[in-house]
A protein has these predicted regions:
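Short gly/ser-rich loop at a beta-strand->alpha-helix junction or flexible surface loop bordering the NTP-binding
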Residues: 1-105, 140
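Surface segments flanking catalytic/ligand-binding clefts of nucleic-acid enzymes
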Residues: 3, 82-202
Length: 202
């Protein structure tokens, strides 16, 4: 069989997957699923070999997740897959074009309009979705800030045209003294360079 779905995502290095999710295999013939292993029939797949295991390609994996998972879970998982592999949304769109008629394909465009591999964690994905659903334009992710030629910071997301940054602060930003010190320095400099910083807490 071929590793697919979350199993393929895992072998491609995707983080933050559900450790209790059933393993997923696809085969050209029909085989019954067994406890802990979900087996599906899929005669045409784009595959590759990862560490000696045959798996669906990153693009095929993302396409399959986008058409089978609930919307927010699909966005979060495809974000993480793109972050881990460097996969681009256009590559998934190209595969979708080649896969017309596939079951669930109608869900794929909605997922891909909101996917961004720049998200470095699920909370960053959730923050981005909250901003968009509040009526704001889709933010750019991983914005690099310079003072002349000197690198100052990389922000989680924001809008360059308005010089507004949004930072998701996990628990460590409040509990780690060294991290707090870095944050104080960072957030003192950015306004001096003309940036407004909005901090979202865990």
């Amino acid at each position: 069989g071929v590793l697919a779905g979350v199993s393929a995502a895992a072998v491609h290095g995707t983080r933050w997957l559900d450790p209790d999710a059933a393993a997923e295999l696809v085969r050209a013939d029909h085989v019954r699923s067994v406890p802990g292993i979900s087996v599906r029939r899929a005669p045409k797949l784009e595959t590759c070999v990862v560490d000696g295991m045959v798996a669906t390609t990153p693009a095929q994996t993302a396409f399959d997740l986008a058409r089978r998972m609930p919307l927010d879970q699909a966005i979060e998982t495809v974000d993480a897959l793109c972050n881990a592999t460097g996969l681009k949304v256009c590559e998934i769109e190209e595969l979708a074009t080649r896969s017309k008629g596939a079951h669930g394909i109608g869900a794929v465009p909605r997922v891909l309009t909101l996917v961004d591999g720049g998200a470095a964690s699920p909370p960053e994905t959730h923050t981005r979705l909250l901003l968009v659903r509040a009526g704001l334009p889709l933010p750019e992710t991983q914005i690099e800030i310079f003072d002349g030629d000197e690198f100052v910071a990389r922000a989680d997301m924001g809008w360059k045209q308005w010089r507004v940054l949004v930072e998701y602060d996990g628990v460590q930003h409040w509990t780690d003294p060294a991290q707090r010190t870095r944050d104080v320095d960072r957030y003192a400099v950015l306004p001096e360079l003309g940036w407004t910083v909005l901090r979202v807490g865990a």
